[in-house]
From Swiss-Prot:
This is Receptor-like protein 50. Residues 23-849 are extracellular. Glycans are attached at residues 62, 98, 200, 251, 285, 306, 355, 422, 442, 452, 531, 544, 554, 590, 605, 743, 759, 791, 811. Belongs to the RLP family. It is a single-pass type I membrane protein. The chain crosses the membrane at residues 850-870. Residues 1-22 form the signal peptide. Residues 871-891 are cytoplasmic. It comes from Arabidopsis thaliana (Mouse-ear cress). It comes from the Eukaryota.
Length: 891
């Protein structure tokens, strides 16, 4: 009994000791380091109970056990902090290299994601020699990755994603992190090539390098990553062929290499059509794949006829390439396939789906915009689970009865654009149809069967022959949000009822009257190329806080652009070719997302809006043919158009001198940069929002060329023609190496043509005509191989026209009215050429006299000798002939 009592006492004492130890587990130096680290940042006071819960550090207090604090885990034996999880904890400040954080040297996991650290990654980060997990996602880091990270030899997870200003190249030494399993660097600004040392990370299972600015090809060493399951290289600027070594990644389940410039050998490079290409072999070897996205590249291969080895495939997207040949029927037999997107390729021939015996799991099928022909196979109706179907621009060779598609009862999205349809008003769509796209279907009447649709979300009936007015019942459809009726023959006044439409596109019709006030709540409004009159509705000023796209070009609108209608989310504004007047709206300075701005051919009277340079995303600015005046540069103006691709201020009354460094800082025109658009909130299902339905006129040598969609992005242009600019052409123009079109004609520029123009290696059109330029045409311009159009006429240039195929192929009118110019293609010879021609002529004359003399002397001797022979021997035949000529004389 005594023994039992003593045992119970011992257990009680030990348990109390353990509790005491547990209570005092936190080491003082660890607690102090944590509290000091917290005080290094500004943390807003929680304004609600929810914020109090979210702020992990809110209950950190001195004289309490730090191992019980939120976000903290300690080693149960030593009491050191081994895990610090402060993700999304409202930390605002700068993580310094001497931060108390680095005193927690036993950390194994550090998560500071979604805080504002506003710093370069300190070299001290390499001091965490036991660190296994480092998560700095979305921390506003900038600069380059420090080399000290190579010291984190135990690291298994590294996430530096969504740090928009994290730059430089991926370090070759990152290949030393041989225990790494997860590496995520998405949405940064990394450049350069992928180091081959990345192939040393043989334990890597997840690699995400998407949304960066890399260059070059993928290294063959990527094939060493045998454990890799997820590979995401979306939008990285890679090019070239995919290494065949990737075919050995047998564990790969998710592959996304979309939106790059990867290529593959096409059918023409195959010695035999029976031989599988390297690309086909690589694809078939990846038998564990479940998700494949190869879209928006430059692949030209044919798909293998038998793809049954990819039995686990659930999603297969190769859209936006140049795949050719027939679509293999084996694709439709894959048992797990849910999504198949083969759109926008060069597939041809009839579609053969094959005999589908078992129920198909296929839910999404996109095969539009190819070269498929022949009748639509009835076997497509066996895909009873289809919820989305796109067969756009299928050459059926005749009229297709719309009713056959109504048998697919699960359809929610249907795109039959470009197919000649027979539509009856008695048709009944499935009640859950959400997206219906019937563009270019030869429809002549508004589809009345839409009147009772209760789920329709997106309707596109553009590019048909529908006449009359838009039926009022359209605006009563309860779920309708996106409407495109452009390129029809709708007429009369546009009668719209108040509704929650997000996007309304009605350009290229015959609407007239005033723009109805009901449009004021719309986020995307495109009414270009109609006959609207009156003013821009003033309701925009007070109602619409979500307007993102406003296109009203080529109407008869008058008045001013409403000053208060332009809010922060505006992304594209085109009111060109109207009768608008007044001043340029200064409220545009609030539109930080603005990319496309066109007010051409109006009557706007104002000075140059230099404050537009503060808009960080502006890519196109067109002020052409207005009444703008004054200088386009002001002293002290240090800003530049960093992302501008198209700059047209022609046909105004701008004046003044441009400083020599005026074009410094025009980054996109200076170097090749593929702008990645991370602007949130503009995705629209089924509508090409990227193009904004943009249209801009480019003038080259008097000819107008309309750039539609993304054309302005390709033709990087500066047009300042038809103004009163004077002084020298800025020498800094030579920085803009990506410039395609440069027009500075019809101004008062003086001085010499800057030799730096020869640096514009991509220039295709150059117009400097009708200025007061003097001196010679720089000879280096003759070496610009793409310069197909040029005009130097009506200046005061002199000297020889440079040699070069492109220059010599120009019409002489391109150099006219420059009295001092000479040489081809002008008729006027240069001074040196005239002397050379004269010397050559004199030399030729001398040679001819010498030749005559050389011929005369032997001829004389020869003649005398022959005469002597003839007169001495007097042959009978000679005397008879001679006597015939001489006898008349004797008479």
């Amino acid at each position: 009994m005594i023994t039992i009592i003593w045992s119970l006492c011992l257990i009680f004492c030990l348990s109390n000791s353990i509790l005491v130890i547990a209570k005092d587990l936190c080491l003082p130096d660890q607690r102090d380091a944590l509290l000091e680290f917290k005080n290094e940042f500004s943390i807003p006071s929680p304004d609600s109970d929810l914020m109090l819960i979210l702020q992990t550090t809110a209950k950190w207090r001195n004289n309490t056990d730090c191992c019980s604090w939120g976000g903290i885990s300690c080693d149960p034996k030593t009491g050191v902090v081994v895990e610090l999880d402060l993700g999304n904890s409202d930390l605002n400040g700068r993580l310094r290299s001497n931060s108390s954080l680095f005193r927690l040297q036993h950390l194994q996991s550090l998560d500071l994601s979604y805080n504002d650290l506003s710093c370069t990654l300190p070299d001290s980060s390499g001091n965490f020699k036991y660190l296994r997990v480092l998560n700095l996602l979305g921390c506003n880091l900038f600069g380059e990755i420090p080399t000290s990270l190579r010291s984190l030899s135990y690291l298994t997870d590294l996430d530096l994603s969504y740090n928009d200003d994290l730059t430089g190249e991926i370090l070759d030494s990152m290949g030393n992190l041989k225990h790494l399993r997860v590496l995520s660097l998405t949405s940064c600004k990394f450049t350069g090539k992928i180091p081959s040392s990345l192939g040393n990370l043989t334990y890597l299972t997840d690699l995400d390098l998407s949304w960066n600015y890399f260059t070059g090809e993928l290294p063959d060493s990527m094939g060493n990553l045998k454990s890799l399951r997820v590979l995401n290289l979306h939008r990285c600027n890679f090019f070239g062929k995919i290494p065949t070594s990737l075919g050995s990644l047998s564990n790969l389940t998710d592959l996304d290499i979309s939106k790059n410039e990867f290529t593959s050998e096409g059918p023409d490079s195959m010695s035999s059509l029976n031989r599988l290409t390297d690309f086909q072999l690589m694809l078939l070897n990846l038998s564990s794949l479940t998700n494949v996205d190869l879209s928006s590249n430059q692949f030209k291969a044919m798909l293998p006829s038998n793809m049954s080895s990819l039995s686990k495939l659930e999603a297969f997207d190769i859209s936006g390439n140049s795949f050719s040949g027939t679509i293999p029927s084996s694709l439709f037999m894959l048992p797990s396939l849910i999504k198949l997107d083969l759109g926008t390729n060069d597939f041809s021939g009839p579609l053969k789906i094959g005999n589908i015996s078992s129920p198909s799991n296929l839910q999404e099928l996109y095969i539009g915009e190819n070269n498929i022909n022949g009748p639509i196979p009835r076997s497509i109706l066996k895909l009873v689970g289809l919820s989305a179907l796109s067969l756009s621009f299928w050459d059926t060779g005749g009229i297709v009865d719309f009713s056959i598609f109504l048998q697919l009862k699960s359809l929610r999205s249907l795109d039959l654009s470009g197919i000649n349809l027979n539509i009856s008003s008695s048709h009944h769509l499935p009640s859950h149809m959400m997206h219906l796209i019937l563009s270019s279907c030869n429809i002549s009447q508004f589809p009345k069967f839409l009147e009772n649709q209760t789920s329709l979300y997106h309707l596109d009936i553009s590019a048909n022959q529908i006449e009359g007015q838009v039926p009022e019942w359209l605006w009563r459809l309860p779920t309708l949000r996106y409407v495109n009726i452009a390129q029809n023959a709708f007429s009369g006044e546009l009668t719209m009822l108040p509704n929650p439409i997000y996007s309304f596109i009605a350009s290229d019709n015959k609407f007239s009257g005033e723009i109805p006030r009901a449009v004021c709540e719309i986020g995307t409004l495109v009414l270009s190329n109609n006959n609207f009159s009156g003013s821009i509705p003033p309701c925009f000023e007070i109602s619409n806080k979500t307007l993102s796209i406003l296109h009203l070009r080529n109407n008869s609108l008058s008045g001013v652009i409403p000053e208060e209608s332009l809010h922060g989310y505006l992304r594209s504004l085109d009111v060109g070719s109207n009768r608008l007047s007044g001043q340029f709206p200064k409220s545009l300075i609030n539109c930080s997302y603005l990319q496309f701005l066109n007010v051409e051919e109006n009557r706007i009277n104002d000075t140059f809006p230099s404050w537009l340079k503060s808009l960080p995303n502006l890519q196109l600015l067109v002020l052409r043919s207005n009444e703008f005046h004054g200088p386009i540069f002001s002293p002290g103006d240090s800003l530049s158009f960093s992302k501008l691709r198209f700059f047209d201020i022609s046909e105004n009354r701008f004046s003044g001198v441009l400083p020599s460094d005026y074009f410094v800082g025009w980054s996109v025109m200076s170097s090749f940069v593929d702008i990645i658009d991370n602007t949130p909130g503009f995705t629209v299902v089924g509508d090409d929002q990227e193009s904004f339905h943009k249209s801009v006129v480019l003038t080259i040598k008097g000819l107008n060329m309309e750039l539609v969609g993304s054309g302005f992005e390709i033709y990087k242009t500066i047009d300042v023609s038809g103004n009163r600019l004077e002084g020298d052409i800025p020498e800094s123009i030579g920085i803009l190496k990506e410039l395609i079109v440069l027009n500075m004609s019809n101004n008062a520029f003086t001085g010499h043509i800057p030799p730096s123009l020869s640096n514009l290696s991509n220039l295709q059109s150059l117009d400097l005509s009708q200025n007061r330029l003097s001196g010679s045409i720089p000879g280096e311009l003759g070496e610009l191989t793409f310069l197909a159009r040029m005009n130097f006429s009506y200046n005061m240039l002199e000297g020889p026209i440079p040699q070069g195929t492109q220059i010599q192929s120009q019409n002489s009118s391109s150099f006219a009215e420059n009295p001092g110019l000479c040489g081809a293609p002008l008729q006027k010879k240069c001074g040196g050429e005239e002397e050379e021609d004269k010397e050559k002529e004199e030399k030729d004359k001398g040679l001819s006299w010498v030749a005559a003399a050389i011929g005369y002397v032997p001829g004389l001797f020869c003649g005398l000798a022959i005469g002597h022979i003839l007169t001495s021997y007097k042959r009978d035949w000679f005397m008879r002939i001679f006597s015939c000529f001489s006898s008349p004389l004797k008479k």
